[in-house]
Amino acid sequence: MNPLSIAQDELKAIQSSQPIVWLNRNYQNPASAPATPNVDALYAAEARLKRFAPLLQRLFPELEPSHGLIESSLIQADRLNNRINPVGGLLFLKADHDLPVAGSVKARGGIHEVLCFAESLALTHGVLKDVDSDYCTLASQSARDLFSKHTITVGSTGNLGLSIGVIGSALGFKTVVHMSSDAKEWKMERLRKRGVRVVEHDADYGAALEAGRLETIADPCGYFVDDERSPNLFMGYAVAAKRLQAQLEALNIKVDADHPLFVYLPAGVGGAPGGITYGLKHIFNDHVHCFFAEPVQSPCMLLGMAGAPGAAPTSIYELDLKNRTDADGLAVGAASQWVCDATRNLLSGVYTATDEQLYQQLYLLKDLENIEVEPSAAIGCLGPAMLTSEAGQKYLDSHRLSHRMENSVHIPWLTGGSFVPDEEYQRYLAKAVNVST
């Protein structure tokens, strides 16, 4: 096992599946992030999504109100704030659980990745003359004929596969999704109805990912969406920070030294929270404080961020953890090394939570704000209370934030839920009521 920047008592807590708050010793240390991407790629992704907006509006009528941009609301949640935030300030919910087209944060990175591939093919084969062309041309039969010769493959616990499958099939690509044993049946069925080939694995996310990778290697017209090391996915997520900046400005919400912003991001393999963190830190610098949130059984990003730069992340299985959690989107055994090496200096810390705690937050979201999410999305709501822990107080004190908390802003990132079938959600809610009352 690689040397980890984790204290002995923290390690014992992790091994015994106890919730902890881990502060990143490499925060603000650029040397700890040898793979930091060029920020130009963020602006290129933002521009690409704008170029594709007319096409996306044509393919997905639900995007008409946003003129083809896939974006979610920022919801002020005062009732929830009164219940879950003991440190003061305002609470907003980033409603990616309700993102159109794919119903989760994965719509950001997954759709951008497929659009990158489609754009490259179209430019290479003359379907698009240049990036100033009419991108609605990509809905033509000639474009679909081109795309149908290629197969897009991805490994997933559920939501990334859903986003890749939806956009890939809409453009005319053959699409294959390798699903881990954690994946929900309704997600697989939704993909099959769109003509996507779903391969089920009786193993974890890592095995599904590797199977997809191997299948693509054998296909000369194959394209693999690599959730572990894809800059295109990463930058699709990073664009969310630009959109959030505009939403905060529209609400006259300041983010500066006297008005710190705290963002709480559910983390699986790391691409989505890593990309969002990268974008937020580029825009708000030291005035934003990003924390990842993971199940106690699957703290892969904690172990990855605590590892040495350039080293393969430690697997949760090396600590005898079982990766068993109802937060299926976060059930990952080992973090993305590339994401860790791209963002290690940007992350404030990681906290972990039990499934029972997730269900308690799921209940509060429904009871107080009438918001329905899947269990993995609820973990961000534990963020404000996390700051009252010994480690949380240490963080606030060391960054001279304690006296500024009355002016702080807190944003749990709700990552998925709107596509969950009602009977599945009712099962979640029944469990949530049971542990909350």
Curated annotation (Swiss-Prot):
Pfam family, one: PALP
Sample GO molecular function, one term: D-serine ammonia-lyase activity
Gene3D superfamilies given in the database record: 3.40.50.1100
Keyword Cell membrane: no
Record-listed E.C. numbers: 4.3.1.18
Protein keywords: Lyase, Pyridoxal phosphate
Annotated protein name in UniProt: Probable D-serine dehydratase
Species of the source: Hahella chejuensis (strain KCTC 2396)
Phylogenetic lineage: Bacteria, Pseudomonadati, Pseudomonadota, Gammaproteobacteria, Oceanospirillales
